[in-house]
From Swiss-Prot:
Organism, as annotated: Ourebia ourebi
Cofactor: heme b
Gene3D superfamilies associated with the record: Cytochrome Bc1 Complex, Chain C
Protein name: Cytochrome b
Subunit structure: The cytochrome bc1 complex contains 11 subunits: 3 respiratory subunits (MT-CYB, CYC1 and UQCRFS1), 2 core proteins (UQCRC1 and UQCRC2) and 6 low-molecular weight proteins (UQCRH/QCR6, UQCRB/QCR7, UQCRQ/QCR8, UQCR10/QCR9, UQCR11/QCR10 and a cleavage product of UQCRFS1). This cytochrome bc1 complex then forms a dimer.
Subcellular localization: Mitochondrion inner membrane
Domain of life assignment: Eukaryota
An MF annotation (GO) of this entry: metal ion binding
Family from the record: Belongs to the cytochrome b family.
PANTHER family: CYTOCHROME B
Gene (name only): MT-CYB
Length: 379
């Protein structure tokens, strides 16, 4: 008799995705981040659900309701901090996952890659709206500044901003709709992640060499289930160290002050995971130009497959491209640092140079290096 997991309509799907899935025998720990992102998403949905039971999306009571969760709800503080720091872990995993994709040429799986870029945008939108909900100073002013960027769109900009606000400023209507969107988006992300996985399983996973691994596959279970469980333990360990020892390390002190439309904080900045894009936005002295650069800084990922000029898929055997990749990582870390600094000398010029370097590396230097490496192979 055939095993039920191979015949049952529902179990068959799970079996083909997580048990009998043929996986390359040589995928490294960089391939762990997909499952870690799934764990992060589940964790965020669960903690978010419990927070929503006690939160009120009203300008008069939102800040107080978050304080109430932390002070009066049983284990409310741990749920709140797991949710806030869970977002940081989510983005660490996301950046690692995307970086892996760039390094090993995984972007040649076009559908998988493009859905991944949509997932990145959706996650960024969710995180932004979630940051507005506690209704602290940085929540309010962050929402005001970022939504205001849409006014740079010619002709329809102003109307669009007022439509999103639900009035003439960020107010009760804005908070209510942001809560609604923040609640629904993670489920859309979960659905998209399923499609992401569906397309990945059409082709099978890439591997560090970038060469077809059809001749050498192993079953996903037990080899990669145990590996994913180890990764999950390390993720939970890192998250709980953050939550239990330094829960406010990555937050902004300004967000412990209730939102006040009459008092602007001296330095408006988003959470750390948006700082690189924020630095690119600020480095262009024109509003529309800055907004375009901001969007392009993420949308440029869609161009990755078109910019792939190398005869090899992975960077594993391409030292020049490897060097440029790590310069890109250093550049992104520089942008992240600049995004958190005030707009003054020397930070302005450093940010502008780092922004130019970012686009130059992806659009010009990396494709050029690939072409040079192709020619070196002929020698």
């Amino acid at each position: 008799m055939t095993n039920i997991r191979k015949t049952h309509p529902l179990m068959k799907i799970v079996n083909n995705a997580f048990i009998d899935l043929p996986a390359p025998s040589n995928i490294s720990s960089w391939w762990n981040f997909g499952s870690l992102l799934g764990i992060c998403l589940i964790l965020q949905i669960l903690t978010g659900l419990f927070l929503a039971m006690h939160y009120t999306a009203d300008t008069a009571t939102a800040f107080s309701s978050v304080t109430h969760i932390c002070r009066d709800v049983n284990y409310g503080w741990i749920i709140r901090y797991m949710h806030a720091n869970g977002a940081s872990m989510f983005f660490i995993c996301l950046f690692m996952h995307v970086g892996r994709g760039i390094y090993y040429g995984s972007y040649t799986f076009l559908e998988t890659w493009n859905i991944g870029v949509i997932l990145l945008f959706a996650t960024m939108a969710t995180a932004f709206m979630g940051y507005v909900l506690p209704w602290g100073q940085m929540s309010f002013w962050g929402a005001t500044v970022i939504t205001n960027l849409l006014s740079a769109i010619p002709y329809i900009g102003t109307n669009l901003v007022e439509w999103i606000w639900g009035g003439f400023s960020v107010d009760k209507a804005t908070l209510t709709r942001f809560f609604a969107f923040h609640f629904i988006l993670p489920f859309i992300i979960a659905a998209l992640a399923t499609v992401h996985l569906l397309f990945l399983h059409e082709t099978g996973s890439n591997n560090p060499t970038g060469i077809s691994s059809d001749a050498d596959k192993v079953p996903f279970h037990p080899y990669y289930t145990i590996k994913d469980i180890l990764g999950a333990f390390l993720l939970i360990l890192a998250l709980m160290l953050l939550v239990l020892f330094t829960p406010d390390l990555l937050g902004d002190p300004d967000n412990y002050t209730p939102a006040n439309p009459l008092n602007t904080p001296p330095h408006i900045k988003p959470e750390w995971y948006f700082l690189f894009a924020y630095a690119i936005l600020r480095s262009i002295p024109n509003k529309l130009g800055g907004v375009l650069a901001l969007v392009l800084s993420i949308l440029i990922l869609v161009l990755m497959p078109l910019l792939h000029t190398s005869k090899q898929r992975s960077m594993m055997f391409r030292p020049v491209s490897q060097c440029l990749f790590w310069i890109l990582v250093a550049d992104l870390l520089t942008l992240t640092w600049i995004g958190g600094q005030p707009v003054e000398h020397p930070y302005i010029i450093i940010g502008q140079l780092a922004s130019i370097m970012y686009f130059l590396l992806i659009l010009v230097l990396m494709p050029a290096a690939s072409t040079i490496e192709n020619n070196l192979l002929k020698w």
